[in-house]
Amino acid sequence: MDSEYYSGDQSDDGGATPVQDERDSGSDGEDGVTEQHSGSDTGSVDHHSENETSDREDGLAKIHNGTDSENDEPSNANASDSESEELHRPKDSDSDSEEHAESPASDSENEPVNQHGSDSENEELLNGHASDSEKEEVSKHAASDSEAEDTLQPQVSESDSEDPPRPQASDSENEEPPKPRISDSESEELPKPRVSDSESEDPPRPQASDSESEELPKPRVSDSESEDPPRPQASDSESEELPKPRVSDSESEDPQKGPASDSEAEDASRHKEKPDSDDSDGENKREDSEVQNESDGHTDRKGLHSSDSEEEEPKRQKIDSDDDEEKEGDEEKVAKRKAAVLSDSEDDAGNASAKKSRVVCDADDSDSDVVSDKSGKRETTVASDSEEEAGKEESSVKKKEDKDLFGSDSESGNEEENLIADIFGESGDEEEEEFTGFNQEDLEEEKNETQLKEAEDSDSDDNIKRGKHMDFLSDFEMMLQRKKSMCGKRRRNRDGGTFISDADDVVSAMIVKMNEAAEEDRQLNNQKKPALKKLTLLPTVVMHLKKQDLKETFIDSGVMSAIKEWLSPLPDRSLPALKIREELLKILQELPSVSQETLKHSGIGRAVMYLYKHPKESRSNKDMAGKLINEWSRPIFGLTSNYKGMTREEREQRDLEQMPQRRRLSSTGGQTPRRDLEKVLTGEEKALRPGDPGFCARARVPMPSNKDYVVRPKWNVEMESSRFQASSKKGISRLDKQMRKFTDIRKKSRSAHAVKISIEGNKMPL
């Protein structure tokens, strides 16, 4: 399709008539175009309403009427052809749209007329503005200009974005028909573009409004652009008039707002107005490049344009519309959607009025209309400026209210920053730390005050029972708290009955007696007398320390320090009695887990370590002392004493760590590192060959292995062994026993008959 549309030799299928015939048959082309346009509208019924279809047809008719002032047939043919061009090219470029399927039929019908008529007649109409007698030269220019337009329009078709509206007003008007595909939330912005469309009498603008979410800026941008398209249509060419304002921009008094700046402003407004659209960034970039290319391509056509006054008029109006769009973008960035919608609707109305005035001034070619047009546009811009200021004020007021209510905007992020600042220090940004939200301390104080007031007003004792206010404690609650504090020290009797009232007294008395006995033994040892006080008290101590219900109480009361006194050596460096050491080490093993603070303050660890390292200590006592030391030190190093929960790998690692250093070296291979057999077998590590470094050309003496084999090898004959074991365990089965009994009975029964006795003694049982 592109090759057919964009061929520069003006021949599509050979059915195209000469340019002069097209001029003569302009009305026929117009009728065909209106049919095709309505067909394309019906083809896009999925995206556009019937009202939009009627709007387009009315717009076409009005555009033809407005342009008939100079060249009736050429203008009608041109307008219709340019419109049909718009319908064809966007459909081809937007190959994804649903209209693409329907466009080829209408395209094939009107291709010759539309392609050649639009290009040639556009140029004719340009020249028609200057003089009606130059139409023959126009046909010559049409070929070259059609090539220029073709070069521009392939760019449009190649980029399937919504930006083609820029490269040509025709594309802008009809590329938005396929864009209705994209329209997902047309409800919000549809009314605005439709108002401007009905006023501007431009059929494509409803379509531009249909390209909502991604085109939502573009309804506005296409309004500013469609301001140009109606003028072009009034001036009998859409593709020609777009370069006219842009080329005149370079010559105008406001050169800084040339095509590039206009497109950039429109792009900026699009960025601001529609940040939600994902494709807006890519579209804007494409628009920039296409607009610049179009402006470069259309500069050649500027010589064909009519008076400079007509150029300056659409140029200034477009600049005003661009200013409005820039302000709209600022509004939508600063203000909320309501203010933006109001200003946009008014801007659309202003654009619509500007479009009407442009159609009139293009038809009349009068400078007075241009001046009135500019003044009307300036009035709309002034109104939009006031609206923008009001929207900005409203948005600033709303932002202040939000800050007063919810604190700063980044309050949620400040929590993490505050945490990091508390942990790692201040961040260094003093300005960011101006937190206007609520302080947690103030909130807690307000809560406490309100709760106090509620507690005073109400008769309930909920807060008092929770222990929040100690001033209101009753005698009963004080007694309960005292009981609860004492409950930790009391233990139940073995039978689970009543509390032992004298448990604490018994435990404390026992500890006092133990300390006294240890002190007396030290004094007797200093006097060179036998120290027998501990031995005499040992049975009583062992009896009480073995009671399960008193063990916790003993530990809490400080029995560990008393045991340390009993296990520590006497002043003459002699160990206490062997019986005392054995009994107390056994009791220490039976005691529940002891806290690190208790071990530290009591000093029991030093006493046990002294026994563990003492050369005269018995082997059994050393083993018990070593187990105690290991058990008490495991929590300090974060190790668990539950070996059942350990995996096999953990147990192997533990055994390797506890292995003596010499055996560990030998088990790992000694000084000579040995190759891993698995690596050798898998091929990762190749076996050494003669000539390789490290190869020894001699036989090796096999060395005994010092490794501890932890994993038992699997038994390969499990089934046979199980059968054998089962048979050996069960022995003779009941069936075998019954069979033997049966055979015995039969033998006996046989022997009951008469038996021939051999005289010689044969068959005699021995």
UniProtKB/Swiss-Prot annotation:
Q: Which InterPro entries match?
A: RNAPII_TF_IWS1 (IPR051037), TFIIS/LEDGF_dom_sf (IPR035441), TFIIS_N (IPR017923)
- Any GO BP: regulation of mRNA export from nucleus
PTM text: Phosphorylation increases its interaction with PSIP1.
Find motif (Integrase domain-binding motif (IBM)) and give its ranges. 416-442
Looking at the record, the residues that make up the TFIIS N-terminal domain are: 561-639
Q: Which UniProt keywords apply?
A: Acetylation, mRNA processing, mRNA splicing, mRNA transport, Nucleus, Phosphoprotein, Transcription, Transcription regulation, Transport
Task performed by this protein: Transcription factor which plays a key role in defining the composition of the RNA polymerase II (RNAPII) elongation complex and in modulating the production of mature mRNA transcripts. Acts as an assembly factor to recruit various factors to the RNAPII elongation complex and is recruited to the complex via binding to the transcription elongation factor SUPT6H bound to the C-terminal domain (CTD) of the RNAPII subunit RPB1 (POLR2A).
Family named by the database record: Belongs to the IWS1 family.
What is the name of the protein in this document? Protein IWS1 homolog
Organism name: Mus musculus
